[in-house]
Amino acid sequence: MTEAGFSPKVHRLRRPKRHHALLVAPSGEWLAAVDGQTLATQAHVDDAALWRAEAGGFRHVVCGVSLSSRAGRGAGSVRLNLGDAEIGAEGGPGPAADFVVGHGPEKRPSESLAAFRDTGWVALTCILAPEVVEGLQRLGGVDGHEGAGEIPRERQLATDPALARATVEPVSLWLCRQYMRLADIKLGHPPGVTALTPDDGERPVQGWHGDFPYMWGSDRSAGAYRVPPGADEGVLGIQRNICVSDFRLENGATVFCLASHGANAVPPAAWGRANQTWKAGHRAENGLPYGGEETDVIEAPAGTIILYDARIWHRAGVNRTNRRRGAVIQAITPGFIIPFYDTTAPFRSWLESDVPAQLDERERRELEELMLHRITGPQGVFAIAPDEALTERIRARGKAASASY
């Protein structure tokens, strides 16, 4: 558990030389060859929505259908033809609609899903468009915006559309839904950019744990985990790390034990669990949590999204540089899991801001689906939100849960 023993295996991701293109309809949905032939728009990005730019138009990556293109009426937009037929707003023949050429993934989503299912983690290298990355860096006060200061987390979603756009990135959400085998997924806490500041050699470093909702190794009370350790056919959590800055070994990239996928167990106590490393004096007495040959670090360029099964053991990295390193850390859970933090207040603030008007209908709809938990029953559908009076009653009776993450 000392710095001298820090020798993880480094998985280094290179910036892609090319990305697939997405053709975004006015609704925000994507033009797809849904059955290998028929063109239509759809609300998710899988292999059917991938295109390759070529001279004079676009060719479908899977079925090879070719579209000709010309400049659209909107800035940076295109209008499309399949043969002599103009492509309408819903993807079929109709009055020509303006499509926007979007920033797609490096690899086919089906390839990424196969890797995710095989190993419990996958990286979408530079999946976010450069302008979205720039907006996230501005919110977090990192990289080129380090001297400008950061926007407080509770205000970020209502300040810049980049955070919402990163949160509703379609390929990572499709992968989460496929990996969990359900459509209704939610955020476990509100989105926000955080910065890992340079290490001072003294402060606590978060130790080994599994993420929400499992929390294996995280709670103060030994064994008081949200989900009991052990094998379970269902997947209750995926962690989504968005690299706002480049993630490197020296600037505090997350330390994993990627081989722990499928272990269904709490991290070893000797490695330095999170429920111990937060305690005052622990670092001075024991050094840093384990980082030896059984561990891994994923180095990735800014704009990369790393998805991993929440049961994979991991711990915080240590920033040994003199610069802040930015990230968006998100827990993705099934809709029936109670969130880790309330997401309704930030969503309400977002609704009351001018940011929704800067997003398309698909982006607004997806963000609402991710942030609003619901009761659906015989009486109808209700949004779930904290009740102040009942919360005070619980706290007054000493029944509030206490945990350190």
Set out the residue ranges of the language-model regions.
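Non-heme Fe(II) oxygenase catalytic core, chiefly the N-lobe of the double-stranded beta-helix
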Residues: 110-119, 128-302, 315-323, 332-344, ...
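Non-heme Fe(II)/2-oxoglutarate
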Residues: 102, 305-307, 311-405
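A short, polar/proline- and glycine-enriched secondary-structure boundary/capping micro-motif
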Residues: 50-53, 135, 265-268, 350-353
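Lectin-like carbohydrate-binding module/patch detector with strong preference for beta-trefoil
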Residues: 1-104
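Residue-level detector of short, conserved catalytic/binding motifs and their immediate flanks
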Residues: 29, 56, 65, 238, ...
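Short hydrophobic-aromatic micro-motifs
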Residues: 123, 242, 306-308
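Short, contiguous pre-domain boundary segments
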Residues: 95-101, 115-122
